[in-house]
A protein has these predicted regions:
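Short, hydrophobic-biased segments on the C-terminal half of alpha helices
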Residues: 48-49
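Short, Lys/Arg-rich nucleic-acid/phosphate-binding segment
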Residues: 61-67
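Short, amphipathic alpha-helical interaction segments positioned at domain boundaries
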Residues: 75-82
Length: 82
């Protein structure tokens, strides 16, 4: 089990986009992304909402869970970054 993320854990947009791209499913929940990057869920949620405003990820609610996936622009961005 990975170590519990600390409150000061810095995470980059690129780490989040890469975590979504490398996920087992095309759409992932906020907690899944947070676990993959080793950051707190609230921190990742803030980043994801900003990325959605920039058009790099898309989101929707499925039941009570918000899921995220890369937009076409997000795929191009992270492919160019990698």
């Amino acid at each position: 089990m990975p170590p519990k993320p600390g409150p000061d854990r810095e995470v980059t947009d690129e780490q989040i986009l890469t975590a979504i791209r490398n996920a087992y499913s095309p759409a992932v929940g906020t907690s899944d992304v947070a676990e993959r990057v080793g950051a707190q869920r609230q921190t990742v949620d803030k980043h994801l909402r900003e990325l959605a405003e920039e058009g790099l990820v898309e989101t929707r609610m499925i039941g009570r869970v918000r899921v995220w996936w890369l937009s076409d622009d997000g795929r191009r961005y992270i492919d160019d970054y990698a």
